[in-house]
Amino acid sequence: YFGSIPGSSSGNTQNTSSDEVNNKQKNPQMITMLIPWIIFWTATSFDSRIGAMIVLLVTALMPLIMRNVKFTIWDRISFALVGVLSVGIFMGGNGGFNLIIDLGYLAFGLMWLVSCIIKDPLCAAYVKYGYGGDIAYNNPLFMKTNYILAVCWGAMYVLTAIWSWLAVQNGVGSILIVVNNLVPICMGLFTAWFQKWYPAKMASGK
């Protein structure tokens, strides 16, 4: 009823404008997925309720802040998970704070692991754009490298959830400030090394 007549110039103009908008958007970036999680774990550690409000605000603004970047399914899932976890902290106060933080680690880890089950390693969804886009999925070496890294990151955060819960239950939760920041840094260094070493090693056949 309100649409343009098929074949008319106005219809072509609308399609062209839509294509131009899509072309202006940058390829997905992993930082889009990471920002809500980083702020969630950081802000809530200083003050649970105020931190939760900050996280909810940032999560709500992410589509605007990153309006020039395409979103992946993992970005959207992260927004939803972090939003739900933040509401839980805000509603529960300090009572269930530690449990919800642990659930956050678990959810983040499972997100990485599930991505491997559905044959789309989370990291590959972002890295592929440096290797030709979707065509990179046809490269067995690229996929295997990303499968390994996704499993490593997923397992690390699932284990983080477990040892964080055990540490709090045994009264040594204070060590988590160091451990839970040091371990991801070490994993990041490992990732930077592995993504170069492993493909080179496999390509050489040694």
What are these language model-derived features?
Residues G132-K206:
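C-terminal membrane-adjacent module
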Residues W37, W41, F79-N94, F108-W112:
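Small-residue-rich segments of transmembrane alpha-helices in multi-pass membrane proteins
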Residues T59-K70, Q195:
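C-terminal ends of transmembrane helices
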Residues T72-G83, L99-L106:
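Cytoplasmic-side transmembrane-helix entry/capping segments in multi-pass membrane proteins
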Residues G95-K144:
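Membrane-proximal helix-loop-helix units in multi-pass membrane proteins
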Residues W41-L57:
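Structural signature of hydrophobic alpha-helical transmembrane segments
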Residues T16-Q29, S45-I50, R67-I77, Y147:
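Short, amphipathic, aromatic/basic-enriched membrane-interface segments that mark the entry/exit
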Residues N68-T72, M91-L99:
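Membrane-interface helix caps and helix-loop-helix hairpins in membrane proteins
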